[in-house]
């Protein structure tokens, strides 16, 4: 599918606004211009007629000197607040008009850039976008799968299971064979898919790349056939990672599904798995016992939670065999596992057990009031250990040994080392100074890990001169440390106007963009193109669960970021609105149903089997005139149903915005009550930024402040965009369809009601409730 500039070969027409009177500009070396002495405060319409109806995602206006600008798509107005910035349109149409009003200065126009896609394009939407794709609509029947090597057989089995899961149909022998082959002349991450009248093949340089080819076949499969197609693809950058903690035992199955349905198909090649006190260590079981005791006291309200307990199995622990389940799942696909062992800082899981190891704890016993003033976070005295304490270091080495034994990493061990607030404080460390203490400790662990045949990875915030956690700069750190360290540069969001990697690249380090959130990373294209910028990783700093990943927008961020990393050298922010729409329409619904094991309902949905269950008719003076076509949901309203449904989709929005504070739970709005004919009822919670958004929101559009970087795409997992339009004033209108799978599809639903919980932002606007049912529920 073509995604990009829609008007490259289209010449605009110029009219006096709201008329058919031609109003051509002058043309000079800088483009078009209307002189102010002729234009005054009149308005000009600049019209583009596209090749056919398109989804218009974004427009770069190219206008200067206008007092006011509006955009119209087939007559629907889009308000423009700042003509110097890209305009997010998110409307379908064929005629695009820019209306610019004069401001008693020359009005200039360099030409607009209209970005979008054609919804009826015959080519499929594939993400990440293949480098080379030649497509024909003609289809070829596939009769069997053929593989002669272990990796090929693994990929064939994966494809068989995936097709059976989705369609309950497999090749039946009445077509050509699809072969799987490891090609020795391919790079490890290159794959090709070729389908002709007589041959079909997936070739790749590794098992993982073969599976990427199989995922493309899944994208293209239709009733036992594939289109004639040639795909030749490989990623631009070598490091494309996902960072997460350990799950609770009951969430291991969720992690396996997340790997299969999210990380694998979108081209991620490694997972950074963080370890704290959340795995039972054979040599030091007391660490895990203290970890569990501290979590128990926290939940009883008798103590503080240990740092990172939320992402560390939610304060519980796993046995090594349970961790190995996750590692084996990743290994099976060929996805590399990089263990992150928290060392030096964020090591409360160690100092909680051995408080005598804490650097600040020792220092505070003798510190003066003046010395305490410049200590960062004195309320966390256990945050760093003293690296000169040999008993402590022996335990650290033991932990690394046990983690490496379980994970069996192929290349790297991540040693953490971020936010080392408390260095150079105790008498031994103070004598050397914090920077040298830091360098010596990194070198010691680097050499210890190198003896295992592995390299070291770490966060790089302590390399930067602007990180002054202990009152000293670390200017010389970058020069003293080994250059084979892999650095994760994550403090970009504290310095949005600076390319912080430029401080480290001249030293020869390889750098990954750490905590790379596609929603907020600035100047990505120019920065990823620099020598030794080798990729990035998407981080989760929350409990490992569908609920938390969904609330933080990680299911959306993963496919979006995959395009940025896979096609790092061709990605453009101009396609953001288009990619956002396509991910919301084509990827998230399928991904969610696969995660839930409900692909049958996705297929039903795809066949337009949604039907209107009913509407909430109420309205009053609180509803703006331009939204009167939506019903106001009152607590007294009850929607009669009288049918069986497998799934309900609540199309709704809040009349007013609800507060959202990062790191706190999302704001409850209310709950629908689904009442069954037999008297039983089920509550369906409605949570702002979860399954519902403010009516004047844009789907998937990141909130600009970097404060929201960790939750960049709220409202994108539990609900899908079902209606996007504009008010007469050009403001956005968005309805989300919150998806609810009925736990009792065999029962007749008698009615649906709603109970508000939280003030004015609990007032709901509704377009109604849709239902999907399979044949056996009718």
Annotate each PLM feature.
Residues 123-136, 152, 325, 334, ...:
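Substrate-binding groove of N-acetylhexosamine-processing glycoside hydrolases
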Residues 1-51, 62-65, 117-121, 597-600, ...:
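Disordered, acidic Ser/Thr/Pro-rich linker "stalks" and the adjacent N-terminal cap
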Residues 63, 592-778:
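N-terminal/edge-of-domain interface segments
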Residues 118-233, 458-468, 472-474, 483, ...:
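Acidic, contiguous N-terminal accessory segments
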Residues 58, 241, 270, 411-412, ...:
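Residues at the N-termini of beta-strands
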Residues 196-437, 443, 712:
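Feature activates predominantly on carbohydrate-active enzymes
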Residues 38-43, 51-53, 57, 61-118, ...:
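Trp- and acidic/polar-enriched beta-sheet ligand-binding modules for extracellular glycan
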Residues 47-49, 58-62, 97-99, 113-115, ...:
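Residues within well-ordered beta-strands of beta-sheet-rich folds
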């Amino acid at each position: 599918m073509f995604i990009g500039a829609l008007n490259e070969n289209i010449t605009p027409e110029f009219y006096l606004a709201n008329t058919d009177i031609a109003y051509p500009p002058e043309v000079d070396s800088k483009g078009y211009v209307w002189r102010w002495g002729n234009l005054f405060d009149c308005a000009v319409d600049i019209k583009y007629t596209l090749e056919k109806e398109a989804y218009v995602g974004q427009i770069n206006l190219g206008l200067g000197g206008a007092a006011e600008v509006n955009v119209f798509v087939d007559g629907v107005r889009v308000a423009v607040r700042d003509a110097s910035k890209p305009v997010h349109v998110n409307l379908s149409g064929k005629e695009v008009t820019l209306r610019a009003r004069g401001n008693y200065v020359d009005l200039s126009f360099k030409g607009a850039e209209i970005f979008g896609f054609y919804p009826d394009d015959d080519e499929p939407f594939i993400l990440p976008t293949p480098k080379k794709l030649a497509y024909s609509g003609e289809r070829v029947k596939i009769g069997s799968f053929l593989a002669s090597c272990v990796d090929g057989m693994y990929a064939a089995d994966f494809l068989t299971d995936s097709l059976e899961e989705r369609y309950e149909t497999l090749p039946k022998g009445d077509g050509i064979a699809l072969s799987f082959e490891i090609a020795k002349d391919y790079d490890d991450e290159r794959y090709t898919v070729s389908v002709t009248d007589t041959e079909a093949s997936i070739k790749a340089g590794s098992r993982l790349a073969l599976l990427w080819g199989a995922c493309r076949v899944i994208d293209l499969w239709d009733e036992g056939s594939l289109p004639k197609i040639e795909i030749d693809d490989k990623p631009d950058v070598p490091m494309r990672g996902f960072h997460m903690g350990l799950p609770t035992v009951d969430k291991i199955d969720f992690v396996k599904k997340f790997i299969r349905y999210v990380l694998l198909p979108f081209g991620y090649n490694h997972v950074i798995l963080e370890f704290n006190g959340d795995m039972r260590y054979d040599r030091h079981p007391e660490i895990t016992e203290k970890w569990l005791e501290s979590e128990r006291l926290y939940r009883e309200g008798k103590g503080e939670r240990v740092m990172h307990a939320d992402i560390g199995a939610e304060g519980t622990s796993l046995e090594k065999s349970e961790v190995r389940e996750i590692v084996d799942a990743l290994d099976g696909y060929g996805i590399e596992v990089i263990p992150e062992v928290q060392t030096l800082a964020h090591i409360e899981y160690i100092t909680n057990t051995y408080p005598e190891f804490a650097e600040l704890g020792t220092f505070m016993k003798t510190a003066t009031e003046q010395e305490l003033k410049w200590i960062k976070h004195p309320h966390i005295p256990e945050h760093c250990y003293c690296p000169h304490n040999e008993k402590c270091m022996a335990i650290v080495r033991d932990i690394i040994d046990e983690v490496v034994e379980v994970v069996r990493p192929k290349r790297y061990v991540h040693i953490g080392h971020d936010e080392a607030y408390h260095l150079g404080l105790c008498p031994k460390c103070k004598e050397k100074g914090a920077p040298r203490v830091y360098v010596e400790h990194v070198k010691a662990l680097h050499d210890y890990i190198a003896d295992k045949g592995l390299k070291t990875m770490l966060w790089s915030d302590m390399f930067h001169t602007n990180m002054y956690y202990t009152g000293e700069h670390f200017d010389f750190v970058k020069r003293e440390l080994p250059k084979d360290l892999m650095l994760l540069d994550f403090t970009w969001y504290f310095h949005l106007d600076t390319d912080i990697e430029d401080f480290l690249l001249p030293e020869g380090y390889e750098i990954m963009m750490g905590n790379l959130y596609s929603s907020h990373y600035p100047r990505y294209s120019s920065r990823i193109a620099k020598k030794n910028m080798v990729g990035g990783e998407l981080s989760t700093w929350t409990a490992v669960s569908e609920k938390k990943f969904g609330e933080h927008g990680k299911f959306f961020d993963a496919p979006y970021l995959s395009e940025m990393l896979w096609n790092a050298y061709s990605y453009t922010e101009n396609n953001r609105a288009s990619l956002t729409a396509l991910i919301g329409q084509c990827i998230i619904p399928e991904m969610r149903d696969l995660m839930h094991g409900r692909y049958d309902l996705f297929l039903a949905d795809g066949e337009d089997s949604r039907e209107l269950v009913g509407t909430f008719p109420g309205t009053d003076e609180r509803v703006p005139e331009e939204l009167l076509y939506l019903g106001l949901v009152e607590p007294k309203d009850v929607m009669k149903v009288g049918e069986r449904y497998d799934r309900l989709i609540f199309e709704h929005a809040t009349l007013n915005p609800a507060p959202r504070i990062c790191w706190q739970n999302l704001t409850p709005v209310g709950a629908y009550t689904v009442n069954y004919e037999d008297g039983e009822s089920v509550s369906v919670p409605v949570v702002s930024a979860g399954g519902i958004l403010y009516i004047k929101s844009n789907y998937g559009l990141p909130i600009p402040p970097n404060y929201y970087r960790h939750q960049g795409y709220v409202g994108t997992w539990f609900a899908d965009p079902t209606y996007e339009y504009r008010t007469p004033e050009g403001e956005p209108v968005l309805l989300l369809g919150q998806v609810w799978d009925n736990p009792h599809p065999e029962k007749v639903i008698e009615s649906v009601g709603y109970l508000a919980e939280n003030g004015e932002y609990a007032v709901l606007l509704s377009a109604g409730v849709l239902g999907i049912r399979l044949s056996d529920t009718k």
